[in-house]
Amino acid sequence: MQDRNLIDVNLTSEMKTSFIDYAMSVIVARALPDVRDGLKPVHRRILYGMNELGVTPDKPHKKSARITGDVMGKYHPHGDSSIYEAMVRMAQWWSYRHMLVDGHGNFGSMDGDGAAAQRYTEARMSKIALELLRDINKNTVNFQDNYDGSEREPVVLPARFPNLLVNGATGIAVGMATNIPPHNLAESIDAVKMVMEHPDCTTRELMEVIPGPDFPTGALVMGRSGIHRAYDTGKGSIVLRSRTEIETTQTGRERIVVTEFPYGVNKTKVHEHIVRLAQEKRLEGITAVRDESSREGVRFVIEIRREASATVILNNLFKLTSLQTNFSFNMLAIENGVPKILSLRQIIDNYISHQKEVIIRRTRFDKDKAEARAHILEGLLIALDHLDEVIAIIRNSETDVIAQTELMSRFDLSERQSQAILDMRLRRLTGLERDKIQSEYDDLLALIADLSDILAKPERIITIIKEEMDEIKRKYANPRRTELMVGEVLSLEDEDLIEEEDVLITLSNKGYIKRLAQDEFRAQKRGGRGVQGTGVNNDDFVRELVSTSTHDTLLFFTNFGRVYRLKAYEIPEYGRTAKGLPIVNLLKLEDGETIQTIINARKEETAGKSFFFTTKQGIVKRTEVSEFNNIRQNGLRALKLKEGDQLINVLLTSGQDDIIIGTHSGYSVRFNEASIRNMGRSATGVRGVKLREDDRVVGASRIRDNQEVLVITENGFGKRTSATDYPTKGRGGKGIKTANITPKNGQLAGLVTVDGTEDIMVITNKGVIIRTNVANISQTGRATLGVKIMKLDADAKIVTFTLVQPEDSSIAEINTDRENSISKNKDN
C-alpha cells in the first residue's frame, strides 16, 4: 500500500525550484543591501536590535554577547558568529567611512588581526547610526513579522542620510555580487541635493560635487575615467595607489614611507610579500622593511640601498604588491525587491523617493497625532466654557457611563472627548489652566495647518529633506581622505620599473647576448693589451657592441633582411666575464638567421629620418623609419634580398647625407644618398658599389667634410684620413683605395667616420676589448698601412669596433654610433 506521506516529484523540477528559492533567499534576505538604507538584513537587525535594547550613544557600552544574543533570538536566527562579525565590521574605522557601531575593546586591526571574542568586547550605537533610525517610531517605514512571528522588525530603516553611498557595500550572493565603494558624507549629501534641485543633471555634472569614492583608509585614485564609467553604468574599475613619500636619511640613503594603504589591503600581508620578493631576488635594492604604525597613524618604512633608485623600486612595488590595487565597481542593490545594477543617479533617485515617503509618513503621523490631541482639547474647552452644567451632569449621574452619555448628548462630544472630561483633574478647572489649554489648542491648529500644507506641497517636502540633511552634514561631515589624481595613470610601463642607466650590449659570433655596465672597461693607451671583457670561449668572439640606455629601443637587423626589436632592459644583465644568453631565447630567428647590425632607435632621434641599407653584394636601399613603427614579435621584412646576398648593415640618415662604403679589399666609394629615392620595405634596392672579384662590403658610414675616415684592419692596424680625401662621386662605381692592404696589416675589418674626440672600443675574435681615444691613432693618407693600435696574439683577428664618448664626458651624452654602423667581419 502506498504511503500517503510520500509525494512523487520530478528531481529536475525539484532541484530547479529549490535552488531558485534558495538563491532568492540569499540574494534578497542576506547578501545584498537595500538601495534605500544601504543595509543588508543582518546590519539592519543589529542596529534595530541595539536601538530596542537601549544601547544608544548616551548609554554605557553593553557586552557584545548580549547584543548578538538578543539580535539572534529575536530577528536573525543564523548563528551568533555571523552577527558578531557584521557588528565588528561596523565598528572598524578602516572598513566603514562612518562607523555605525562604537566598539569598546579589541575589534581587530587593518593588519588582519581578528576581534576578541564577543564575551570580552562591548559596543553601543554610534551617534550617526541614530540618524538611520530617527523617526522610526513615527510609522515612517513598514514593519514585518520576524522569523517566528513573535516580534516585528522594520523592512527598511528611515536612513536620514544616503548610507549606501557613504559606507558602500560588499557581498557575494548566488550568481551575483555587489561591490559599492564608500563616499564622503558631505559630497554624497550635496549630490542628493543637486538631483533634487536639478532633476535633469548629468553624471558629469554630478561628479562636480561627488567626484569619486572616499575610502576610510585614504590613498590615491589614479584617473577619473573609470569613475565616470562606473557612475554612469554601475560597473567599472579604478586603480588605488598607496600614498607614499621618499625620504632622505641623514646618511644620504633613501627610504620609502607609506602613510596610506588602498582600501581593503592587509598591511601585514604586504610586509610579508615585500620581504619574500626581496629574498627571491625578484626585487633588489631593499635592505629592511618596518611597520612603524602607531596611534598617531600608519607609517610603513622600506629602507633602500644607497646605490639603488627609490623611484624605480617604488614603481616595482606598485606593480608587484598590493601597494597598488584595482577596485571594481559592481553597484548591485535591491530595488523594489529585485536585485539590480544601479547607476549613481539611480541610487540617488531611489534614496530621494525613500526620503519623500519617510517625510510624508512622518508628517501624516504628526498630523494625526496633533489632530487627535486638538480633538481632546476642543472637548476640554467646551467643558470649561460650561463648567457648572458639566459638573451638574456628572453629579446627577449614577455611573460614569451615564455621565459620559449625557455629556456626549448635551454638548455633541465624541466618546474620546467625553472620556477626557471625566478624566480631567479638578485643578485643571482653574482659569490659568483654561488659558494653557487654549494656548495649546491654538498651537496645535497652527501645526495641523502647517503639516497639511507640507502634504499638499511637494516642494516643501524637498526643502525639509535638504534642511535635515544639511544638519546631518554640519554635525558629522569630515574632510575627504582619498585624493583623486588628475590624468590616467592606470598602468605602469615596463620602463617605470627599470632604472634608466647607460649600458653596453654585446653580441657574440655564436649569438650570445648580454647587458653590462658601460664603465666596466677603462681607457688604455694605443697598443695596450686590453681586458678580458666578454666571457666568450676560444671558438667564439664578440661581433657587436652597442652603447645605449636601458630605456632605449634596439632594432636588430639580420642577414636575411629582417628586423626585430627589443628594449635594452629586456636583455638580461650579466657580469663582465659571463657568456650571456643565446639571442634565440629573445628573438624568433629562423634557421641560419643571424644578427648583422644593432641600431639604437630613440624616437626623438629617428623622427623624419630613414634607414640606409647596405648588402654584402653592394646593393643599397633607403626606407623611412616610420615604416618600422609596428614590428611584430616574429619580426618584419626590412628589404628583399637577391639570391646569395645578405644584409651587411643599416644606417640612420636624414635623406641628404653623404654615404661612404668600404670593401674588404680596401676600396671605398662616396656618394649622396639623395640619389636614391625612398623605397618600401619589400623593395630590393639599387647598386651602391661595383665590387671587384672576391670582394665584399665591410662597412658603411655617413660622412661630412669636417670629419675623418677611420679604418682598422684585421691585424690591428688603424689610421685616420681627412674626409676631403674622399671625393663625392656617383653611386655604383668601383671606388678608390682607402688603405694599403698587405699581409702585414691584413684585410679591412671596418670603416667609420669620426670627429677625433671619441673613444674607440676594438674587439677581437678572442673576446679581448681595448678602449683608446681616436686621437691616439695617427693621421695618414688614404693609401697607407696605418699604425698598430692593438697587440694581437698570433691567431687573433680584429672583428669589429664601435665608438663611445670619452670617459671624462657626461655619460648621458654617450653617442652609440647613431651616425655609423659597422658590418660584421664574417666570411659568408
Curated annotation (Swiss-Prot):
GO cellular component, one term: chromosome
Subcellular location: Cytoplasm
Keyword list, A-Z: ATP-binding, Cytoplasm, DNA-binding, Isomerase, Nucleotide-binding, Topoisomerase
CDD domains linked: TOP4c
Main location: cytoplasm
Biological processes annotated in GO: DNA topological change; DNA-templated DNA replication
Catalytic machinery residues: Y120
Chemical reaction(s) catalysed: ATP-dependent breakage, passage and rejoining of double-stranded DNA
Residues in Topo IIA-type catalytic domain copies: 32-497
Family indicated by similarity: Belongs to the type II topoisomerase GyrA/ParC subunit family.
Name of the protein described by the UniProt record: DNA gyrase subunit A
Organism: Streptococcus pyogenes serotype M6 (strain ATCC BAA-946 / MGAS10394)
